[in-house]
């Protein structure tokens, strides 16, 4: 038996952004950047470790909107063009920097090599479908993939029982479609919990969820082992809470590893640094400058201005990632030894949940850190064993019964990020749509029917117009409920886009509802909305009935 258990949990999520009405769209780059910098590197690392005999073990949420985007042919095609454009620029850069700067030339060569490797993985190994790659990793025992709320809806701010239930049940149905099994666990959007949510999870046959630290620490009764063992609610749903120490070592802007001077600087990008005419062929048709992903500078120092940043040296950054991984493991061993003294002879569990996008997008060397971490865990020590929450539940260790408290992992630990003076205007519209959705479901659902996972092969054109409208009403409500819009408005980033997205889904909901009320179907408009917001082909509106 090890001294301690460690559970790395990655949360891979992006809001559903797909704009077939335009030939290209800036916010679709969120997905494309994440594929290049996060998902492809992590999948490749996990598979390489497994094939080399150093099998990693971790949990990962691949959210339903992300699954739907990764499996979408339009977005797959657009990503391929995005990557080919980036490779073309990188090749130009390799030629340009050869004469101008040896330091920058080494970085340009690195980009050419890594991007060409990414294109090969994308086209040839993974056949442009990363959902299948994640599924294979789960089938091979590397990942325990968990689900998330259907569109990352913030459950405590959803007004009706039926709309909350739908966020869970639709997520489960979508998970089954993509991964061919039932999810054991769920990452509640923003780790947002309030008492009663566990009843919805139990109904959906979900065994556990992830919470923030204070959900357990302030629960009733006081947790005997703090956050270093799960608790279980009265109805049997387990709760795994975030460990503070590991969170700070990676997340903290002051002491976290990603802030090291040798790591790549995120904000210096060729899209802004290079001559405009030089990069213009690689910009969108609007010609507006944007991040392109090729960055040549290192952090250098926290207080060093952007124009004083020094050249990025990949070899030094890689060595630092290895050093940080060793330090992280050493700290986990010390932590486990200290905790074990009060744990009645069984190993403590350290749960470390992070946004997956930290590893590769915000922290370029993050995938290297994970690679070194699992190699060193396997080859260099025996005190720490990496497991998933499901593995812990399967161990049969006794778990304390507790009622967790309301919480989220947002600023200050509760709900203010998602409801405040900047975004509170959204909720009357959302809550009205939630109420009306249940009214429509009650009116049109077959009496006595129960929600079943529908066949994903069911063609839209074979459904009755009323059924198509009702299912699209559900999609528009779900997309409006995405917590990403309120979060980005609070953060002050992409405020216009987030506001417009929320408003457009409410507007489409109202237009569709008016069709239903009048009994006059605008076939052309309905087809246009279905083609634009095509998430969850398998959806069944009757889940909203009470």
Identify the residue ranges that each predicted region occupies.
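Hydrophobic, small-residue-rich alpha-helical packing segments that form membrane-like cores
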Residues: 192, 197-206
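Acidic (Asp/Glu)-rich catalytic clusters
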Residues: 2, 47-55, 129-146, 165, ...
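Short, solvent-exposed turn/loop segments enriched in Gly/Ser/Thr/Pro and often Arg
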Residues: 61-66, 149, 185-194, 214, ...
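Intrinsically disordered, low-complexity repeat regions of secreted/extracellular protein precursors
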Residues: 448-463
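Active-site and substrate-binding clefts of carbohydrate-active enzymes
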Residues: 2-57, 62-106, 221-448, 464-546
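Glycine-rich phosphate-binding "P-loop"
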Residues: 147-170
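Conserved short loop/turn motifs at secondary-structure junctions
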Residues: 183-193, 355-359, 494
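CE4/NodB-like, metal-dependent polysaccharide N-deacetylase domain
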Residues: 164-188, 331-344, 348-351
């Amino acid at each position: 038996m090890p001294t301690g258990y460690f559970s790395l949990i990655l949360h891979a999520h992006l809001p559903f952004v797909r704009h077939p009405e335009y030939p290209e769209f800036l916010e679709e780059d969120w997905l494309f950047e994440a594929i290049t910098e996060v998902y492809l590197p992590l999948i490749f690392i996990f598979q390489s470790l497994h094939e080399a005999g150093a099998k990693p073990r971790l949990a990962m949420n691949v959210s339903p909107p992300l699954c739907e985007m990764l499996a979408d042919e339009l977005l797959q095609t657009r990503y391929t063009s995005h990557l080919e454009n980036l490779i073309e620029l990188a090749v130009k850069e390799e030629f340009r920097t050869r004469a101008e700067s040896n330091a920058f030339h080494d970085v340009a060569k690195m980009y050419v090599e890594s991007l060409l490797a990414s294109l090969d993985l994308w086209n040839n190994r993974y056949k442009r479908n990363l959902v299948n790659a994640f599924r294979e990793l789960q089938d091979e025992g590397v990942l325990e993939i968990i689900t998330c709320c259907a569109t990352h809806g913030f459950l405590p701010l959803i007004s009706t029982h039926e709309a909350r239930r739908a966020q869970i049940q639709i997520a489960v149905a979508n998970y089954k479609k993509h991964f061919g099994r039932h999810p054991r666990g769920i990452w509640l959007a923003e780790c947002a919990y309030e008492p009663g949510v566990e009843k919805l999870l139990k109904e959906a046959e979900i065994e556990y969820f992830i919470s923030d630290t204070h959900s357990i620490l302030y629960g009733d009764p006081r947790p005997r082992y703090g956050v270093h063992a799960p608790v279980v609610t009265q109805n049997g749903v387990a709760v795994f809470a975030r460990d503070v120490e590991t969170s700070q070592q990676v997340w903290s802007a002051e002491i976290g590893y990603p802030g090291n001077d040798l790591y790549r600087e995120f904000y210096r990008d060729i899209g802004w640094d290079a001559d405009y005419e030089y990069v213009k062929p690689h910009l969108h048709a609007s010609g507006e400058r944007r991040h392109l992903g090729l960055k040549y500078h290192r952090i250098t120092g926290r207080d060093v201005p952007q124009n004083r940043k020094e050249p990025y040296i990949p070899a030094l950054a890689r060595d630092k990632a290895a050093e940080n991984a060793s330090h992280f493991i050493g700290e986990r061993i010390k932590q486990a030894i200290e905790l074990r003294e009060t744990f009645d002879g069984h190993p403590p569990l350290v749960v470390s949940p992070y946004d997956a996008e930290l590893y590769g997008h915000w922290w370029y060397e993050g995938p290297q850190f994970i690679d070194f971490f699992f190699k060193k865990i396997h080859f260099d020590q025996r005190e720490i064993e990496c497991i998933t929450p499901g593995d812990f539940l399967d161990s049969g260790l006794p778990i304390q019964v507790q009622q967790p408290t309301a919480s989220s992992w947002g600023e200050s630990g509760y709900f203010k990020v998602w409801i405040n003076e900047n975004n509170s205007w959204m909720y009357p519209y959302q809550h009205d749509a939630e109420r009306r959705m249940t009214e429509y479901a009650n009116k049109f659902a077959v009496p006595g029917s129960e929600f079943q996972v529908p066949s994903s092969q069911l063609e839209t054109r074979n459904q009755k117009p009323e059924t198509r409208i009702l299912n699209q009403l559900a999609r528009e409500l779900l997309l409006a409920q995405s917590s990403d819009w309120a979060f980005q408005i609070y953060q002050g980033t992409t405020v216009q886009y987030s506001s417009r997205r929320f408003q457009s889904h409410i507007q489409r909901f109202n237009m569709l509802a008016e069709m239903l009320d009048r009994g006059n179907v605008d076939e052309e408009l309905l087809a246009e909305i279905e083609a634009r917001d095509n998430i969850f082909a398998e959806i069944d509106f009757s889940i909203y009935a009470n």
